A protein has these predicted regions:
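Soluble or luminal CAZymes and related metallo-dependent hydrolases
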Residues: 42, 71, 210
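Conserved hydrophobic/aromatic pocket- or pore-lining residues that grip, position, or stack substrates
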Residues: 79, 198, 278
Length: 311
């Protein structure tokens, strides 16, 4: 009995130490739909059924400074070459019709054909547009050498129509108004005063190495044309949570242990009992969360936070 009594503390400390090491080696899932979760959530089950029918498709939003449609088009073209990318949507690749892109630049003669407006009026429009934007090529040079993005031109024409500067017949006015509604909707979705949004889709798993490599490649491609960019997606969220979770969790655990020790010391007015109680409490937490590692399962990080808070 005496020998067993002497051995028990060492066994207790050894178990706690092993639990602490194994729990730190546990693999956490940061996306609720992760396939590796032992007990899927209702959301993940529903999503899995949808994916089985329609296929998996995740979105990646790339935020870049607005105002340069040519650079945006180059970014879209370059990123689409990535094998993990399925599709891209931005103003620079949105079609106006079968022959034109919204951000494509056209001259006065092409505008006359596209909008069915008198050519001389189109020339005046281009000269007025150039003057308002401090671009005088249309005034002092050949007006047909001056080109304007379709989306900007139509916005300008609609603005002048509202001010009564331009008078068109009823059919032309209706066509311009209908097109303006479509352009406004596209700009609201994909462009603000300072930034443009390009939306890509990809099919690799959210927390896979393939997805994380794809994010690195996309950022590298975008930074070839822009000094600043933001990437937003479920994969970005999972990667950022994974990068910060370990360090933050260790800091919180340390602060919790120190705070608990301090409270127990004031309560029991001794050093031995608080240390023993903290070891018992924190040891049980470590032992509990070492089980997923031993069973080879991933633990959803929110479940870990909730359970560890309760314990």
């Amino acid at each position: 009995v005496i020998k067993l009594k002497n051995i028990v503390p060492y066994i207790f400390i050894a178990i706690i130490a092993v639990g602490a090491v194994l729990s730190s080696m546990s693999n956490y899932a940061f996306d609720a739909t992760a396939e590796q979760l032992k007990k899927p959530t209702e959301n993940s089950i529903a999503k899995r059924k949808v994916d089985e029918i329609f296929g998996t498709d995740h979105q990646l939003a790339v935020i870049v400074p607005s105002g340069d449609y040519d650079r945006e088009a180059k970014v879209i073209s370059l990123v689409e070459e990535n094998p993990s990318i399925n599709s891209a949507l931005g103003l620079a690749n949105t079609e106006l019709d079968d022959d034109h892109i919204l951000t494509e630049k056209i001259n006065a003669r092409e505008t006359s054909k596209l909008m069915n407006i008198d050519y001389d009026l189109c020339c005046l429009l281009f000269q007025a547009y150039g003057a308002e934007h401090d671009e005088y090529n249309a005034i002092f040079g050949d007006v047909n050498d001056y080109e304007v993005p379709i989306i900007d031109l139509f916005m300008y024409v609609h603005e002048k129509m509202d001010l009564g500067v331009i008078n068109l017949d009823e059919d032309q006015t209706n066509d311009i108004n209908d097109l303006y509604d479509k352009l406004t909707d596209a700009k609201d979705q994909l462009e603000s005063d300072n930034y443009s949004r390009i939306i890509f889709t990809y099919k690799c798993d959210i927390e896979s190495d393939e997805a994380y490599q794809m994010l690195k490649d996309v950022r590298s491609d975008v930074e070839k044309y822009y000094d600043e960019c933001l990437l937003v997606s479920d994969s970005v969220n999972s990667r950022d949570l994974g990068d910060s979770f370990g360090g933050d969790n260790n800091k919180i655990n340390l602060i919790t242990i120190l705070a608990l020790l301090l409270i127990l010391m004031f309560t029991f007015r001794s050093a031995g009992v608080p240390v023993l109680l903290v070891l018992a409490i924190q040891g049980s937490v470590w032992i509990n969360f070492s089980i997923p590692f031993l069973t080879g399962q991933r633990l959803y990080f929110l479940a870990y936070l909730v359970v560890s808070s309760i314990q």
